[in-house]
Amino acid sequence: VAESYVERAPWPELASAVRTVWIQRTGETAYVQRHLPTGGVELHFPIGGRPQLVGPLTGPNVEVIAPRTTLVGVRFLPGMAPPLPTVLDDLVDERLDLEELWGDSAGRLAEAIAGAAGPETALDLVQGQLLRMFRSAGVDPLVREAAQLLMPWQPVEIGRLADRLAISTSQLRRRCLHTVGVGPKTLQRTLRFQGFLALAQAGATPSGRRGADGLAGLAVDVGYADQAHLSRECLRLTGLSPRTLLGGSMDQCGCGHDHAASYRPFLATRSRPPLRQEAARFVQAAPTRRT
């Protein structure tokens, strides 16, 4: 059995909360998986095993997946975690058994997944459970909008962002910590790096505004000062250099996995209106000052 990893878009009803879902199979030997910060949390459901939640990451998290394991997973957008009994800043860089957070419902879901006809059915069971949970749970629309406005394609200073959302910087930070797990500046840095990975995965052609090197061009396109700035951030977030992470290729990660489904909605935000228009629309929609 060969190792495989296949991403896809979530159910349309979950697209506002879930960035991607996937099915992963390991081969005859254990597989070393390097999880990177994405700004969101993840749920991992090894079929026949114990489901886990991976909290918001601020650096690389290395996991050894046992041989002959089949796993289905869900990656959430920033600020759009599934209903949990705690704030997300308590879960930063943590890996927890889902039963600790969801109680018996996690165990029942794990049993249903273990008895599923296959991983496709197991993934449907997970998405169905999430859909039921999100229908009865609320989200913080301000933080969701802040996360969109922190995308690298329209860089903004955090103080200006708070002003445009009609709250103080301390309020913005507190609400981000509770619902994203990290402050807005950390989220902005994470999303900028995700933007670089998205461009690399898509095989984007750099603008060439600085230097002839492809990495340097993409670095500037996504908001880094130069390639050295990108390299420092890549080492901090992944523990690897950009070239090592990409495996020497500009259109895939070093592990060979195709993450197009994960980055497709991310790249779509490049066509959003300028920040000034977005913030004005959001503030006009809020009749009172949020606290």
What are these regions (language model features)?
Residues 176, 188, 234, 246:
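DNA major-groove recognition helix of helix-turn-helix
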